[in-house]
Curated annotation (Swiss-Prot):
Gene Ontology cellular component terms for the protein in this record: extracellular region
Subcellular location: Secreted
Stored InterPro entries: Scorpion_toxin-like, Scorpion_toxin-like_sf
Pfam families tied to this protein: Gamma-thionin
Chief localization: secreted
Disulfide bonds: C3-C49, C14-C35, C20-C43, C24-C45
Signal sequence interval, chain numbering: none
Family designation: Belongs to the DEFL family.
Listed Gene3D superfamilies: Knottin, scorpion toxin-like (3.30.30.10)
Protein name: Defensin-like protein 1
Domain of life according to the entry: Eukaryota
Keyword tags: Antimicrobial, Disulfide bond, Fungicide, Plant defense, Secreted
Length: 49
């Protein structure tokens, strides 16, 4: 089961899901990451709950 959290290391709009995914995995030890529009485009990281 994965839990979503806004990235703590991403700044600005998220326009590249691949980069968001790499940054979440490499910098925040997440399982993966993706860009989602929540007001504006943000990078969200996904972790084991």
């Amino acid at each position: 089961n994965l839990c979503e959290r806004a990235s703590l290391t991403w700044t600005g709009n998220c326009g590249n899901t691949g980069h968001c995914d790499t940054q979440c995995r490499n910098w925040e030890s997440a399982k993966h990451g993706a860009c989602h529009k929540r007001g504006n485009w943000k990078c969200f990281c996904y972790f084991n709950c």
